[in-house]
Amino acid sequence: MGTIKDTVSKDIQAQKAVGIVEKSEYEQALSQYNLNITDEEVKAAVTKIIAEKVSENDNLEVKKFLLGSVELTTLSTTDTEEKVLEMVEKVNRFDSEYPDLPHVAALCAYPCFTKLMADSLEVDGVDITNVTGNFPSSQTFLEVKTIETALAIKDGATHIDIVMPVGKFLSGDYEGVCDTINELKQVCGDVPMKVILETGDLGNASAIKTASLLSMYAGADYIKTSTGKEKISATPESVYVMCQAIKEYYDKTGIQIGLKPAGGINTVMDAVIYCTIVKEVLGEKWLTNYWFRMGTSRLTNLLLSEIIGTETKFF
């Protein structure tokens, strides 16, 4: 099944053949969607979902699902091999200590630790996620981004998270944004690639929707809210807009795109709210730990504590 980019490229070629002056590829892709959304209408929609739907998802079954959707993350300047290995070993022990609970969906760290994680992880079904492409700023040469991504995959990464070139996006260089994402997706091949939008830096709902669509159009397998390194990370409003973009893209193309809220998920209720928004906007098809991921460190112990009914700091 082709992407929007494939379809638009064919349309452009046909128009050129008859001498029609056309919009650029990215303009044609965006023109198929309604980008005239306001922050006020998004906030109203989110408030309604929270008021009417969240309570029905605040239960043990949903919390177990959320635990199984976590990408257990360490992305600190002070990370060491010992710290990363300790995180891996906790995941290795989890099944024996909590046999009735789902293990986390993935471990997420910098790519210099990938081989260590790949060599020491013993649990089937847990992905190794790497942030590449000069995370968190994305401000470097494209060649550096491609080499880092290729090395991460060579060492055993099974998911790649990159940051959209936010500066290019804010300056209106949508072609540059798409070219970068597409180039890195070509490096990833069959390895799923998440594109981090850094929604807190984009300014408004319309910009978040535009960035979401451009990223999917350029090859993202998932879109992700944030690096967790900026002042504003994931919010219910940004997740709602991203879900709307995913739904519209899916309705037009039949291509399912995953979602990963990350950064600032500080409470179990935060996670329940995100899950509820996904359920209401995208539906049950997205409520698997393949299509829905959460990037977090602190939330994992909070979820586990609520599930077992006593405070624990296992992770």
Where are these regions (language model features)?
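Alpha/beta enzyme core
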Residues: 53-69, 73, 77-102, 112-259, ...
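Charged, compositionally biased N-terminal leader segments and the immediate start
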Residues: 2-68
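N-terminal start-of-chain detector that recognizes signal peptides
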Residues: 37-41, 45-48, 101, 232-233, ...
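Short, hydrophobic beta-strand segments that form beta-sheet elements in well-ordered domains
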Residues: 107-109
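Metal-centered catalytic cores of metalloenzymes
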Residues: 301
